[in-house]
Amino acid sequence: MATDTLSIVVEFTGGLEMLFSDQRSHKLSVPKTDSKGAPVTVGWLVNYLCDEIMQDSRKDMFVLDDHVRPGILVLINDADWELEGEASYELQSNDNILFVSTLHGG
């Protein structure tokens, strides 16, 4: 029987975990398709994380103009998301998406 959801793992490091209730790893079950019936993408996931998972009000520390903020490295299954199509990458079951802040205050 086919399922209508994907099981993925989303991780945050470099201080980003503080925006997500200090939880570094999140095992999520997300729909296979968005509200328009298109396959869900990393871009969709970023919005989902902001709307459904992030409890912190400082969303601007994660996104800027509806895009992942500059200075945040995104890895899809240990590969730079630039090699995978960035926000247009279509999520697959068992994907591991890692967000790493490369900016640190001092």
From Swiss-Prot:
Q: Name one GO biological process term.
A: protein urmylation
Give the location in the cell: Cytoplasm
Q: Which InterPro entries match?
A: Beta-grasp_dom_sf, Mopterin_synth/thiamin_S_b, Urm1
Record carries keyword Cytoplasm:
yes
The pathway is: tRNA modification; 5-methoxycarbonylmethyl-2-thiouridine-tRNA biosynthesis
Q: How is it modified after translation?
A: C-terminal thiocarboxylation occurs in 2 steps, it is first acyl-adenylated (-COAMP) via the hesA/moeB/thiF part of UBA4, then thiocarboxylated (-COSH) via the rhodanese domain of UBA4.
The family this protein is said to belong to? Belongs to the URM1 family.
The job of this chain, per UniProt, is described as: Acts as a sulfur carrier required for 2-thiolation of mcm(5)S(2)U at tRNA wobble positions of cytosolic tRNA(Lys), tRNA(Glu) and tRNA(Gln). Serves as sulfur donor in tRNA 2-thiolation reaction by being thiocarboxylated (-COSH) at its C-terminus by the MOCS3 homolog UBA4. The sulfur is then transferred to tRNA to form 2-thiolation of mcm(5)S(2)U. Prior mcm(5) tRNA modification by the elongator complex is required for 2-thiolation. Also acts as a ubiquitin-like protein (UBL) that is covalently conjugated via an isopeptide bond to lysine residues of target proteins such as AHP1.
Name of the protein this chain belongs to: Ubiquitin-related modifier 1
Organism of this sequence: Botryotinia fuckeliana (strain B05.10) (Noble rot fungus)
Gene, per the UniProt record: urm1
